[in-house]
Amino acid sequence: MHLNENTKILGHRVILVPYEARHVPKYHEWMSNETLRELTASEELTLEEEHEMQRSWREDSDKLTFIVLDAETYSRDQDEIAAMVGDTNLFLHQDPDSQIPTAEAEIMIAEPYARGKGFGREAMLLMLKYAQSQPQLKLDKFEVKIDMDNAASLHLFKSFMFVETRRVEIFHEVTLERPITPDWINWLDQQVDLRMQCYQ
């Protein structure tokens, strides 16, 4: 999606930047890890296929992607590749039952050293806040689909007041949803400040 191609989002622990071609080799390295692929329901791709995927995500109007940087590492020498720790995505669609404009959210902290430090929580809060603040997206609801064994992600989204709505045993998957209401936006505003800069 072109919406965020010039947007950098600044948090305390993390910085979100658009997914660029220069990020692909490290992303590809992450996705060679079988456990990560299982947790994210991803297929193993060649480096060339990963580059094609990055280009397609940039062009597709229904996908919004940021790379998550460790803010402390980035502050040392502004090396984005060295600071990369994960990514966060939104997939936009109409809810098949209600036709409500919905965004399916994803967060991945790929670097083992970066887990358990609040990076995923802050990155996801920033992504949710950014998306709900963009009037052109016209979102009414967020949802997540999480592997039943991914206790950390289930706990994270329940702490964001997402509620389980569906459980599909055959896919070993749980769906949680969060309507975008004024009360929830107020809660979100208390969790993070949305600070943005122009990204070159």
Curated annotation (Swiss-Prot):
<keyword id="KW-0012">Acyltransferase</keyword>
<comment type="similarity">
    <text>Belongs to the acetyltransferase family. GNAT subfamily.</text>
</comment>
<keyword id="KW-0808">Transferase</keyword>
<keyword id="KW-0539">Nucleus</keyword>
<keyword id="KW-0206">Cytoskeleton</keyword>
<dbReference type="GO" id="GO:0120519">
    <property type="term" value="F:tubulin N-terminal-methionine acetyltransferase activity"/>
</dbReference>
<dbReference type="InterPro" id="IPR039135">
    <property type="entry name" value="NAT9-like"/>
</dbReference>
<dbReference type="GO" id="GO:0046329">
    <property type="term" value="P:negative regulation of JNK cascade"/>
</dbReference>
<dbReference type="GO" id="GO:0007026">
    <property type="term" value="P:negative regulation of microtubule depolymerization"/>
</dbReference>
<keyword id="KW-0963">Cytoplasm</keyword>
<dbReference type="InterPro" id="IPR000182">
    <property type="entry name" value="GNAT_dom"/>
</dbReference>
<dbReference type="Pfam" id="PF13302">
    <property type="entry name" value="Acetyltransf_3"/>
</dbReference>
<feature type="domain" description="N-acetyltransferase">
    <location>
        <begin position="34"/>
        <end position="181"/>
    </location>
</feature>
<dbReference type="GO" id="GO:0008017">
    <property type="term" value="F:microtubule binding"/>
</dbReference>
<comment type="function">
    <text>N-acetyltransferase that mediates the acetylation of the N-terminal residues of alpha- and beta-tubulin. Required for microtubule stability and inhibition of JNK signaling to promote cell survival during development, possibly acting independently of its N-acetyltransferase activity. Necessary for the stabilization of spindle microtubules and for mitosis progression. Regulates microtubule stability by inhibiting Spastin-mediated depolymerization and promoting Eb1-mediated polymerization.</text>
</comment>
<dbReference type="GO" id="GO:0035331">
    <property type="term" value="P:negative regulation of hippo signaling"/>
</dbReference>
<dbReference type="GO" id="GO:0000922">
    <property type="term" value="C:spindle pole"/>
</dbReference>
<comment type="subunit">
    <text>Interacts with microtubules as well as alpha/beta-tubulin heterodimers.</text>
</comment>
<dbReference type="GO" id="GO:0005634">
    <property type="term" value="C:nucleus"/>
</dbReference>
<dbReference type="GO" id="GO:1901673">
    <property type="term" value="P:regulation of mitotic spindle assembly"/>
</dbReference>
<dbReference type="InterPro" id="IPR016181">
    <property type="entry name" value="Acyl_CoA_acyltransferase"/>
</dbReference>
<dbReference type="GO" id="GO:0005737">
    <property type="term" value="C:cytoplasm"/>
</dbReference>
<dbReference type="GO" id="GO:0031116">
    <property type="term" value="P:positive regulation of microtubule polymerization"/>
</dbReference>
<protein>
    <recommendedName>
        <fullName>Alpha/beta-tubulin-N-acetyltransferase 9</fullName>
        <ecNumber>2.3.1.308</ecNumber>
    </recommendedName>
</protein>
